[in-house]
Amino acid sequence: MRILLIFCYFLIFTLCFSCGESPNKKEENNAKEIDASELKNQKTADRKVILFFGTSLTAGMGLDPNEAFPAVIQEKIDSLNLPYEVVNAGLSGETTAGGKNRINWVLNQKVAVFVLELGANDGLRGVPLTETKSNLQAIIDVVKEKNADTKIVLVGMEIPPNMGEAYTSEFRNIFPDLAKKNKLELVPFLLQNVGGIKELNQPDGIHPTAEGQKILANNVWKVLKPVISK
């Protein structure tokens, strides 16, 4: 009888201990999951936005979004543990006029760095150079008005000589002129070492392949890295 009582006490103690332990472990695991989720959200919230505003070259037309040069730059940023989040606002076929019309909508978030890549489609369509330059200036003005602390990187472009030597030359000069006037960082030529190289472009001969996009990323990174490392 005594042995039976001892066994019963042992059984009750074991059951009570077991029943009390499971909820604690469950709560502990839930707390850990919540903490991890909050930490991830906090890290995202703490990251400053780099907004890439451009054409199909920025959007990565014909490729997976992760192969576009802004995404490649995000990988470079992450490898250095820099607190920045890339937002790709590239749009295929975008002109400076189109960019001017949508800039206010795009700037509905706080932007630390604004990378402006527009003008190529204007040049290919023969848009008057004064109009292209005016539209780019208007976009720059809006960015500065929204937040004077936003750093702006202007991406230079060149076009084939189809429109004539004078037009081509003046088009090229738009970007350094605007960069100097507004004290912006300038990427001299986005398609450097990619434009006109068959194996680095898709069949249309205009849009870079994934390998070409990596070179574009390097071209931009040379200018962008010092800006976000300060």
Task: Enumerate the language-model features and the residues they cover.
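Alpha-helical cap/lid subdomain in secreted, periplasmic
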Residues: 100-230
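Active-site metal-binding loops of divalent metal-dependent hydrolases
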Residues: 55-56, 120
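Short catalytic helix/loop segments, enriched in acidic residues and glycine
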Residues: 67-79
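Short hydrophobic segments within beta-strands
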Residues: 53-54, 155
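N-terminal secretory targeting modules
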Residues: 1-53, 59-64, 78-83, 109, ...
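A short beta-strand-loop structural module common to alpha/beta enzyme folds
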Residues: 82-95
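Conserved Rossmann-like nucleotide-binding pocket used by diverse enzymes
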Residues: 15, 87, 153
